[in-house]
């Protein structure tokens, strides 16, 4: 059996809702759905994610809306970033943010979860948003490079775990590398 993992940069979850993203959720209902650029306060994210649960249930993907596991990290800078992750698979663990990054600009950019596949394997899935840098603004570039360095460290940890027989990892997102 395979699982479906989808990633979407929604460019604002409230705008995506106005455009009918909940209909897409009900039609496609991926096993894991990584979302970037949520750009909304927690209350708005919670209510929209609840609607996604109803869409998954209506589509027959889950028995009840509460069976859709939702996690997100809003950005502490209003109107910026924000990542989410929805899954109907069993959640084994959740982690928010990257270790060592505590500045507001680094919030809402990384969440990961360990899920159990129908075959019983555990995998790590991360929803990632790497902000765009701008060489005209050295501070923003320094922030981006610091985030990328920390992300590379975490990616190395995930790689090493997989190489030693541990969980495989899937990173989904908007990486803004160029």
Regions found by a protein language model. Name each.
Residues 1-7:
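Extreme N-terminal starter segment of soluble prokaryotic enzymes
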Residues 8-15, 101-102, 142-146:
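Short, flexible loop segments at the rims of nucleotide/cofactor-binding pockets, characterized by
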Residues 8-9, 25-43, 125, 155-178:
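Active-site beta-strand/loop signature of hydrolases that rely on acidic residues for catalysis
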Residues 14-26:
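Short, acidic/polar
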Residues 22-24, 46-53, 142-143:
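Glycine-rich, phosphate-binding/catalytic loops in enzymes
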Residues 39, 44-135:
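Structured beta-strand-rich core segments of catalytic domains in phosphoester-bond hydrolases
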Residues 136-141:
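A short secondary-structure junction signal
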Residues 143-155:
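Long, well-ordered alpha-helical scaffolding segments within enzyme catalytic domains
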């Amino acid at each position: 059996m395979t699982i479906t993992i989808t990633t979407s940069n929604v460019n604002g979850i409230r705008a995506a809702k106005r455009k009918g993203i909940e209909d897409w959720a009900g039609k496609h209902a991926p096993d894991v759905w990584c979302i970037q650029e949520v750009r909304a306060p927690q209350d708005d994210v919670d209510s929209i994610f609840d609607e996604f649960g109803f869409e998954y249930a209506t589509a027959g993907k889950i028995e009840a809306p509460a069976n859709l596991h939702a996690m997100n990290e809003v950005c502490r800078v209003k109107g910026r970033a924000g990542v989410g992750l929805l899954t109907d698979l069993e959640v084994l663990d959740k982690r928010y943010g990257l270790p060592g990054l505590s500045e507001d600009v680094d919030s809402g950019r990384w969440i990961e979860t360990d899920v159990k596949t129908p075959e019983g394997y555990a995998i790590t899935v991360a929803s990632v948003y790497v902000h765009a840098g701008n060489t005209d603004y050295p501070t923003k570039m320094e922030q981006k490079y610091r985030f990328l360095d920390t992300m590379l460290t975490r990616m190395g940890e995930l790689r090493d775990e997989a190489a030693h027989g541990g969980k495989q990892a899937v990173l989904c997102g908007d990486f803004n590398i160029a």
